[in-house]
Structures are given as C-alpha cells and as structure tokens.
Amino acid sequence: MIGRLQGILLEKQPPEILLNVQGVGYELLLPMTSFYDLPEIGQETTLFTHLVVREDAHLLFGFAQKTDRTLFRELIKTNGVGPKLALAILSAMSVEQFAYAIEREELSKLTKIPGVGKKTAERLLVELKGKFKGVKQSDFFVESTHIPLSPSIESHSESSSDEAISALIALGYKPAEAEKMVKRVAKPELTSEQVIREALKAAL
C-alpha cells in the first residue's frame, strides 16, 4: 500500500495532478480542499495517499493532511459512498465543516453536494455521528487558508472559467449546473482554483 508520496509537481488540472517521485510519474486525484494547498508547478510537495484497486483501474488519491485521508476512508466505508463521491464531499467541505454538519445533523448542507441524496445523507449521519467528538468546537469554524493571487498562474478569465467548469464536472456536477456556478463567482483576476473554491463555497 502506498501511504505517502513526496516529489515534484509536474502538472495540475483540477482535480488531477502528476507527481514526479524519483523519475516515476504518479497520477493522483485530489479533493479541492487539498488542491488549494499545492505549491507551484516545479516545486516539491508531500501528499498522504490512498490506493483504490478496481478491476479496470488502480486509482491513487492524494491528501494534503492526514485528517483528510482519514475522513475519506471513513466515507468510503459508508454504504452507497464510493471514492468519487467521497472526493466530491471533501471538495465541497473541509473536514471541520463536514464534522460540524454531521454533529448538527444538517441534512440540507449535505444534500447540496452532487451525488448526495437524502438517503445517502441520512446514512452518513447514522454511520458517522459521534466520530468527531474529539474535534474541538473552535476547529469547526476555521476558515480555509487564503490563496494569494500569483502572476505565474494563468489568470485569464475565460481559461480559468473553463478549467473550473471542467473540474466541477469531474467532481459530479452536471455541465449546466457547473457553468452556472462558475458564472456566478468568476472574476477576471481569479485563478481557476480560486473560482472553484468560490463556486463550491457559494453552492453550500
């Protein structure tokens, strides 16, 4: 089992990246909450990983924090929640936000995530409620780290919006819905990652 990778970031196209580890290129899928923490292309990064083995593919998922991977593993244990849906959940909410929604039994927030219907949300509440009692109450309200604008990242509004729409579709949103979400928040000065984050935040 591959549990951790450290290497040079070669490519990033939300939610996928290519990581060079001693000459071997690893393709990883990341939730957007981890994607936001990535450095610039060409820089080194370390990710905690989880390997999903299927008949048709081996999928490697990466996480900036071990707590993100822990929640991912708890989610895929839940009946009806596969890796793709777990990725969408972790992209829409931080671990703290998800824990707070579970402990407060906020079904409406959970059902706004693509692929999470009422029954799935109820199963998540039943199976995961109480598992976050060790999380400090103050941690529930930690805001996502602000990402400064970087001149080295493509900031042209059209390409940023297109990349953001593609990423949201990959996370399970319907094309028309993804386009509407992006149009609502897109600004010329925002990078694709910032557009995605604002779109996901507005959706909740």
Curated annotation (Swiss-Prot):
Residue ranges of the TM segments: none
Classification via CDD domains: UBA_RuvA_C (cd14332)
Main location per the UniProt record: cytoplasm
GO cellular component, one term: cytoplasm
Gene Ontology annotations of biological process type: DNA recombination; DNA repair
Positions of region (Flexible linker): 144-155
SUPFAM superfamilies to which the protein is assigned, alphabetical: DNA helicase RuvA subunit, C-terminal domain, Nucleic acid-binding proteins, RuvA domain 2-like
UniProt-annotated stretches for the region Domain III: 156-204
Keyword field contains DNA damage: yes
Leader peptide range in chain numbering: none
Region annotation Domain II: where it falls in the sequence: 65-143
Any one GO molecular-function label of the UniProt entry: ATP binding
Domain notes: Has three domains with a flexible linker between the domains II and III and assumes an 'L' shape. Domain III is highly mobile and contacts RuvB.
Family: Belongs to the RuvA family.
Quaternary structure and partners: Homotetramer. Forms an RuvA(8)-RuvB(12)-Holliday junction (HJ) complex. HJ DNA is sandwiched between 2 RuvA tetramers; dsDNA enters through RuvA and exits via RuvB. An RuvB hexamer assembles on each DNA strand where it exits the tetramer. Each RuvB hexamer is contacted by two RuvA subunits (via domain III) on 2 adjacent RuvB subunits; this complex drives branch migration. In the full resolvosome a probable DNA-RuvA(4)-RuvB(12)-RuvC(2) complex forms which resolves the HJ.
Protein purpose: The RuvA-RuvB-RuvC complex processes Holliday junction (HJ) DNA during genetic recombination and DNA repair, while the RuvA-RuvB complex plays an important role in the rescue of blocked DNA replication forks via replication fork reversal (RFR). RuvA specifically binds to HJ cruciform DNA, conferring on it an open structure. The RuvB hexamer acts as an ATP-dependent pump, pulling dsDNA into and through the RuvAB complex. HJ branch migration allows RuvC to scan DNA until it finds its consensus sequence, where it cleaves and resolves the cruciform DNA.
Protein name stated in the entry: Holliday junction branch migration complex subunit RuvA
Species the sequence originates in: Haemophilus influenzae (strain PittGG)
